Amino acid sequence: MARYTQRPENALKRANEFIEVGKPLRALDTLQEVFRNKRWNYAYSETVIEPLMFKYLYLCVELKKSHIAKEGLFQYRNMFQLVNVNSLENVIRGYLKMAEEHTEAAQAQSSAAVAVLELDDLDNIATPESILMSAVCGEDAQDRSDRTILLPWVKFLWESYCQCLELLRVNTHCEALYHDIARMAFQFCLKYNRKSEFRRLCDKLRKHLEDICKSSNQTTGVSINKVETQQLCLDTRLYLLDSAIQMELWQEAYKAIEDIHGLMALSKKTPVPKTMANYYQKLAMVFSKAGNQLFHAAALLKLFQLTRELKKNLTKDDLQRMAAHVLLATLSIPLPSAHPEFDRFIEADKSPLEKAQKLAVLLGLPQPPTRVSLIREVVRLNVPQLVSEDFRNLYNWLEVDFNPLNLCKRIQSIVDIIETGPTETNLLSPYIQSLKDVTIMRLIRQISQVYESIEFKRLLELATFCNIFELEKLLVESVRHNDMQIRIDHQKNSIYFGTDLTESQREYRPDGPALQSMPSEQIRSQLVNMSTVLTRAVSIVYPNRERDQRAKLRTQMVHHYHEIKDREHQRILQRQKIIEDRKEYIEKQNNAREEEEARRQEEESRKAKLAEQKRLELEQEERERKRHQNEIQAIKEKSLKEKVQQISQTAHGKKMLSKLDEEGIKKLDAEQIAKRESEELQRERKELQSKLKSQEKKIDYYERAKRLEEIPLFEKYLAEKQVKDKEFWEATEKTRIENAIAERKDAVSQQERLKRMYPDRDEFLEALKKERASLYVEKLKKFEIALEAERKKRLADRVIRRREERRQAFLREKEEERLRKEEEIRLAQAAEERAAAEARRLEREAEDEKRRAQYEKQRAKEEEAERKIKEDRDRLAREVAVERERSDKERDTWRPRGGDRPSAAAAGGGGGAGEWRRAAAPIGDRNERAGDRIERGGERMERGGDRMERGGDRMERGGERTERGGDRMDRGGERMDRGGERGERGADRDRERRDNEGADSSWRVRREPDSQRGAGVKDASGSAAPPSRDDKWRRGGDRDRDRDRDFRNDGPRRDRDDRDDRDRGGFRRNDGPRRNDDAAPRETGGNWRDAPRQSDRDNRRPAGDRRDREVRGGDLRGPESRAPKEGGPSGGTGTAAGGGGNWRTAPGPRDEPAPKRDQPQDKGKFSLTPVQL
């Protein structure tokens, strides 16, 4: 018996019952069984499954069973992702909301537990336990409480987010929900400071994006080529970037920036300026935290350009603040190294150039920026003119003016302004240290151009904002990175610049303000300077020489141009043609590639659609099959459940069923359950009777003894209680009387005291009434006037309102009347359409019935034809068997007989030739021709099957069911064809058997040597004489003559087939030449019968040959069609035949034309007659 499974609504009720009795695990198992059962997946709608799913997820959250919730969510997604996406979204949001609420409650509970612990003992705050715990684990009470109470719920919530993201990552209908859950997960990491989970979440989202990009060609799923998908992914990555910056996870922020840049590059739509501004701002922040001042300044410059170009309502203060930020960030870039290729020997993974190129791509720059290029761009954008005077001076002092003695003092004033400025200026404070380092480097470079040596003390006075150690470090860095010739003499506390005049490693290119070159640079470029000066002097001494040289050179150039201008012109034209051809070739290739890509995408789309359609059809069929099975199973379960419920209505039935589990109940039938119920009832009755008897005795003795002992005790207790009650009543009554007397005395005294105030009260009331009477009258008049005006106003409003109501009522009645008429017209049209549809349906049913009757009639005809075919086939088989049996009997009778060949034959007369040609055919030939008849009958059946197939094709236009009749008749023709083949194989087997028998039993003569053969005496012409009648090949001649005589005496037989007579060895007068007759025996001394013969099957024409059909169908034609043509190969007249005609050529009664048989008149019907067979 199949396992019993509950319906979803019953499972929900049972789960609620388990929850009420405190068994949530059993309730969860009950609901889980429903989702594990494949029967209910497609049998119910979301209105039935959704409440059950909410209860299922509620239990999973309560029990912290995230893996069970995942199983249910995936099953629910498979059920309703293509049917009702809103239901799936509601379920997932409800699940996450429940998990978040439980996590927040756990956090509040953890905080409350810590507060209770902290306020437990105010006198002893630091308990020994808390001291020991803090020393062992280094955690406070809050951390321990969170680990115990909050951390399990945090883990459950994190798993829930991951499950939902995995659930929705490839669902194109839930993209918005997927990205909402991703943002909720970011908020979760921010709220609970989960950095490791945040990294895993970023990796998970990045992996999902890679999967989407890989499967972008598929039509089923999320496609990154859609604009909506790209925008959602971009917004999610921007939110991820904000969250990473808030959590100070700069590596994840950089990866998010790479993802954002990739999405913006992938999108065909230009990102909005607000998004680009946010992108550049976050990118500048990441570069700043990474310590890359160069790209930080480049990002701020891009942000400044974007804001200045696209923001129309930008105020002057905002523009000034942004310009100051960009200028200070650019000036704070450290001075570049003179030989950056040295870093290649230190870096292990990638060269700095590759890293810089990769970062430049994020900023949309063609090549990595440099400090010089950024300052040049800042000047081009007129940034120094937009900032305040102080920052403009800062730019001039660092990049334009050469004043090393006052440089640090000037920069210090700017630093003080930044440090003491307003709040918005404090945003520039991170650039102070970088600005100081750049200033010190500028100071060292400018000092090296002015002084050859300087003391440390003096240099420290000039560098006001650094100590000796920082200054020495900067000097070493300048030597290492900037190729400055600096030597520090600690003994004399002095510094020497450019002392080695023989060393100059590179060409000096001044960066910033410069006064003069270094001595080593001057020595290195002395020859260059000398050459320049000498060239200038020569041009002054010989002013015309250069002019003559230029004229001569010009003449040569013109001459050379005239020589090659044609060739160059042709080359240019040819190059232009090559370029055009190349463009056309590239364009053709691009067009072909686009067409191929479009064709491929179209083909993939078509295949995907076909696959999806096929999948949907298979799913529909599977759902229908499962629904049908579910209905059958539900009926069985319902009947069993009704029986169980009928038994469980009684108390003893419930008790009996409680002892059995569900599996045990399923294994029982109704009779077994009724038997157990009766047994349980009998057993309970016996137990109850025995208990009642035992308790009767016990209660009787016990109650009697107890009451006898209670009587004196009850009497004593009642007496004491009466005395105590009387005393209590008397004391209570005395107290009540005393309280009543005291209350009356107090009330009387109060009344007497208040009587003196009555005159004063009356006087006051009279005076107050007189004072306010006039005011009351005036207000009353005003009120009456206002009341009258309001009454008139309301009356007028009521008149207007009633008029409007009547108008609206009239319009509503008109509209209702119009709608009623339209409804009547619509109903009449619908009735007419239904009547027309019903008429069409009846007409179709009549046509179907007519077609069905035709099909039944045709089927009856086909069955009759098959029956006739079978009867004819059996008749032919019987005839072959009878003839074979008769030939076996005749073999023993005609073989011993024989005779000499007629002398006329020996004389070579024509009559003799005709006589021996018409001798009886051998048995093997008759059997073989019988097989040929069967085969020809099979071929006729095959042609009949073809005709029936064509008839079936014609009937196919009338309906598909008629086609099966043609197929059956086609199979009938094939069966008859196989029957003919079997008959042919039978004839072949008989012939082989007779050929393999001995010489005495065979009509053929074995080939023997001439000496053993006993050939006849040759005549004078040298040809062998015909053998005597005693030879083996003439045995049976008398039998043939007797048979021929019998044939003549039979008279005409109209129902006999001529071919059957010929096949059985008979001959006819005036038979004419036969197509299969052999030529006359040649005078070669041999026996023509001994020569090997070809099989008749080898001589036959194909079944479709017209001549073959004419020969085989000769019985249906007249004598004219069977008469031999004149001048045939074996005519009975003419000298060549050796004589005139004989008695065999005379017409006999058997040669009379057979009467024509009636042919079927109905050409549309198919039937087979015995003649056709």
From Swiss-Prot:
GO biological process, one term: translation reinitiation
Subcellular localization: Cytoplasm
InterPro entries according to UniProt: EIF3A, eIF3a_PCI_TPR-like, PCI_dom
GO molecular function, one term: translation initiation factor activity
Biased amino acid composition, Basic and acidic residues: 836-900, 925-1011, 1028-1081, 1090-1125, 1149-1165
One of the Pfam families matching this protein, by short name: PCI
HAMAP family the record matches: eIF3a
Function: RNA-binding component of the eukaryotic translation initiation factor 3 (eIF-3) complex, which is involved in protein synthesis of a specialized repertoire of mRNAs and, together with other initiation factors, stimulates binding of mRNA and methionyl-tRNAi to the 40S ribosome. The eIF-3 complex specifically targets and initiates translation of a subset of mRNAs involved in cell proliferation.
Family membership: Belongs to the eIF-3 subunit A family.
Protein name (record): Eukaryotic translation initiation factor 3 subunit A
Organism, scientific name: Drosophila persimilis (Fruit fly)
This protein's encoding gene: eIF3a
